[in-house]
């Protein structure tokens, strides 16, 4: 009976880990057809954001330049000009299809992530007792570690998150989140987040050492500073 009770929190933790993947898989299959039909029927003429609008306008400017080039080439025969115009027309249709698919993809991913967040929030709320048990296990495990291992683990974690090479990792992670939500890649926003997050984490971590570790385990702080130096 005790083993069964101990297995329930572990099963709950495993379900939390794999539940987002299952929700994403189910939502992508069930929502894709509905969103595609809704979008194509609605035929919306507004852009989702200014970044996408700028990208589309740049594409149409390129097509306009091609049309101007078409007018400049007068020495071509009428047949060649018709073929040239037909090629531009096909490229325009293909571009519109690609842009339409991109916008459907954006709505699908945003809706899927929103549904996943709501389901996980409700799942976590109804399983608070199991989360408390898991938290007690983690605290007991950390308590049994030596101060040297704790200091080494803290140093390793901080170097990974706010160390010298951390901006590249933040860039990859934030870029993945952007892509997962279906947002367009915007270099200025990405650079701003990459340069801001490590600074915020570093400030929070130093405050945590000053307020919590100095009070709970002064020896751990001494070992941490000795290893860090």
Swiss-Prot record:
Subcellular location, principal: plastid
UniProt topology in membrane: Multi-pass membrane protein
Q: Name one GO biological process term.
A: potassium ion transport
Which residue spans traverse the membrane?
6-26, 107-127, 189-209
Q: Which reaction does it catalyse?
A: K(+)(in) + H(+)(out) = K(+)(out) + H(+)(in)
Q: Which GO terms describe its cellular component?
A: chloroplast inner membrane
Q: Could you tell me where this protein is found in the cell?
A: Plastid, Chloroplast inner membrane
Which domain of life, per UniProt? Eukaryota
Q: Which UniProt keywords apply?
A: Antiport, Chloroplast, Hydrogen ion transport, Ion transport, Membrane, Plastid, Plastid inner membrane, Potassium, Potassium transport, Transmembrane, Transmembrane helix, Transport
- Give one GO term, molecular function aspect: antiporter activity
Tell me its family: Belongs to the CemA family.
What the protein does? Contributes to K(+)/H(+) antiport activity by supporting proton efflux to control proton extrusion and homeostasis in chloroplasts in a light-dependent manner to modulate photosynthesis. Prevents excessive induction of non-photochemical quenching (NPQ) under continuous-light conditions. Indirectly promotes efficient inorganic carbon uptake into chloroplasts.
- Write down the PANTHER family for this protein, in alphabetical order: CHLOROPLAST ENVELOPE MEMBRANE PROTEIN, CHLOROPLAST ENVELOPE MEMBRANE PROTEIN-RELATED
Q: What is this protein called?
A: Potassium/proton antiporter CemA
Organism listed in the record: Nasturtium officinale
Top-level taxonomy = Eukaryota, Viridiplantae, Streptophyta, Embryophyta, Tracheophyta
């Amino acid at each position: 009976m005790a083993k069964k009770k101990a297995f329930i929190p572990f099963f709950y933790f495993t379900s939390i880990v794999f539940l987002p993947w299952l929700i994403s898989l189910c939502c992508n299959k069930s929502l894709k057809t509905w969103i595609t039909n809704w979008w194509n029927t609605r035929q919306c003429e507004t852009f989702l954001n200014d970044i996408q609008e700028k990208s589309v306008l740049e594409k149409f400017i390129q097509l306009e330049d091609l049309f101007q080039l078409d007018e400049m080439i007068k020495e071509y025969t009428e047949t060649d000009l018709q073929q040239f115009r037909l090629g531009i027309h096909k490229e325009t249709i293909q571009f519109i299809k690609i842009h339409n698919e991109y916008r459907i993809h954006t709505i699908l991913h945003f809706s899927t992530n929103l549904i996943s967040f709501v389901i996980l929030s409700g799942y976590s709320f109804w399983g608070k007792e199991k989360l408390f048990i898991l938290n007690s296990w983690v605290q007991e495990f950390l308590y049994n570690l030596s101060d040297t291992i704790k200091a080494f683990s803290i140093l390793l974690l901080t170097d990974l998150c706010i160390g010298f090479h951390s901006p590249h990792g933040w860039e990859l992670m934030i870029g993945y989140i952007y892509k997962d939500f279906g947002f367009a890649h915007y270099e200025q926003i990405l650079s701003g987040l990459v340069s801001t997050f490590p600074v915020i984490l570093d400030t929070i971590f130093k405050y945590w050492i000053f307020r919590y570790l100095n009070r709970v385990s002064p020896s751990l702080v001494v070992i941490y500073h000795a290893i860090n130096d």
